[in-house]
Structures are given as C-alpha cells and as structure tokens.
From Swiss-Prot:
GO terms for cellular component: cytosol. This is RWD domain-containing protein 1. It comes from Homo sapiens (Human). The gene is RWDD1. PROSITE patterns: RWD (PS50908). SUPFAM superfamilies: UBC-like. The lineage of its organism: Eukaryota, Metazoa, Chordata, Craniata, Vertebrata.
Length: 243
C-alpha cells in the first residue's frame, strides 16, 4: 500500500532544497506551497515571471495536484492560458510519480519561449515600421501613380477651381464695366480740368509774386554788344562770323 504522506513529505524537502529562494509553504494540511518561476533575461534584461501555487490531493502522486497561477509579471492573458494548458498536459502524463519538479521545469521552458517571442515580435514591429517609413519616402519622392480613379478626382477638383476663377473674373469685369467712363464723360472731365487751371490763374490775379532774385545774376553776365563792332553790318549776316 502506497504511503502518500511519506512521498509528499520527501518531495517537499527536495523542492525546498532545489528552490531555496522561491519556495514558500502556505499550509501543511493539506500541503500547499508556491514556487516562483522566472525566465532567462531577454532583450534589455526583460523577464517574465509567474508564481505557481500547488496543493497536494489526498492520493497524490496517483492523482494530479491542484495548481493555479498565483501571480504573474509581464504575461499576456493568452500566455497565462497556455501555461495552464501545459500544466494540465504534464500532470496527465506524469500520474503515478512525483511531478512538481517536472511541472516547474516545463513552465520555466515556456517562459523562456515567451521571452523569445517578445523579442521576435518587437524585431518584426521594428522592421515593419522601417518598411512603412521607406514606402512613405518612396511615395513622397515618386509621387502618386496616376490611375483612372485618382485622375478623375483630380480633374473634377481642377474644373471646380477653374469655374470659381472664371466666376470671379466675370464679376470683376462686370464691376469694372459699371465704373468705366464713356468717351463723352472723359472729354467733359478733361474740359473741367482745363477750366479749373484757368480759373486758378484768374483767382491768383495780382497775388502772383515773381522772385526777382532769379534775375539778379543777369547783371554779372559779360554780354558782347554786336552793335559796338565797327565791322558789324546788319544786312550782312556773315559779317558777324568774319572774325
């Protein structure tokens, strides 16, 4: 007859020796304990971690222990679900023998896989962003390829803008036509300007002042009187140039 209590006590001692820093006893009856499992360091020393809680059933190891995710860090919901499925599979495969070390080892490997997946996912995201940036740069350099659809869209927009320009121009020309003077109006306007100049002079009358200083320097000019020349003949134009 199997002594389940003895097997459970022996395994507990072994687990405490293997996991001295992460093994914690929660209760002795029924035997319940936790083991914290941490992945290897990934990119930027990032890790994922979970604390597994186990409780021995009365006939363990012929019956599977009770287990649950007691706590976790950096795990997605789907990761937690995958770990629980893994524990169920491993417990089923190891019935009849003590299995906690085997279950913990399987979870340890799973956490390492998750870290690798996180690294791969980030690398793919980085490559995707670089690809999108490169495509955007190419698009900016080469422009948008002309298709029937985008040409028709451009044509409709162009026609609408052209129509607005024509309407604006017609409105300006119409407004200019209203303000444009006829030939008769231009003539009357010029005549009125002449009349206003004459009227200005008449109104000035004797009030117009002449600046005599403009003529003061005339006295300083040495003018030669041609009539004092004895050879000067008024009837002979060439006599003046005989000299």
């Amino acid at each position: 007859m199997t002594d389940y209590g003895e097997e459970q006590r022996n395994e507990l001692e072994a687990l405490e020796s293997i996991y001295p820093d992460s093994f914690t006893v929660l209760s002795e009856n029924p035997p319940s304990f936790t083991i914290t499992v941490t992945s290897e360091a990934g990119e930027n020393d990032e890790t994922v971690q979970t604390t597994l809680k186990f409780t021995y059933s009365e006939k363990y190891p012929d019956e599977a222990p009770l287990y649950e995710i007691f706590s976790q860090e950096n795990l997605e919901d789907n990761d937690v679900s995958d770990i629980l499925k893994l524990l169920a599979l491993q417990a089923e495969e190891n019935l009849g023998m003590v299995m906690i070390f085997t279950l913990v080892t399987a979870v340890q490997e799973k956490l390492n896989e998750i870290v690798d997946q996180i690294k791969t996912r980030r690398e793919e995201e980085k490559k995707q962003k670089e690809k999108e940036a490169e495509e955007a740069e190419k698009q900016l350099f080469h422009g948008t390829p002309v298709t029937i659809e985008n040409f028709l869209n451009w044509k409709a927009k162009f026609d609408a803008e052209l129509l607005e320009i024509k309407k604006k121009r017609m409105k300006e020309e119409e407004q200019a036509g209203k303000n444009k003077l006829s030939g008769k109006q231009l003539f009357e306007t010029d005549h009125n300007l002449d009349t206003s100049d004459i009227q200005f002079l008449e109104d000035a009358g004797n009030n117009v002042e002449v600046d005599e200083s403009l003529f003061q320097e005339m006295d300083d000019l040495e003018l030669e009187d041609d009539e004092d020349d004895p050879d000067y003949n008024p009837a002979d134009p060439e006599s003046d140039s005989a000299d």
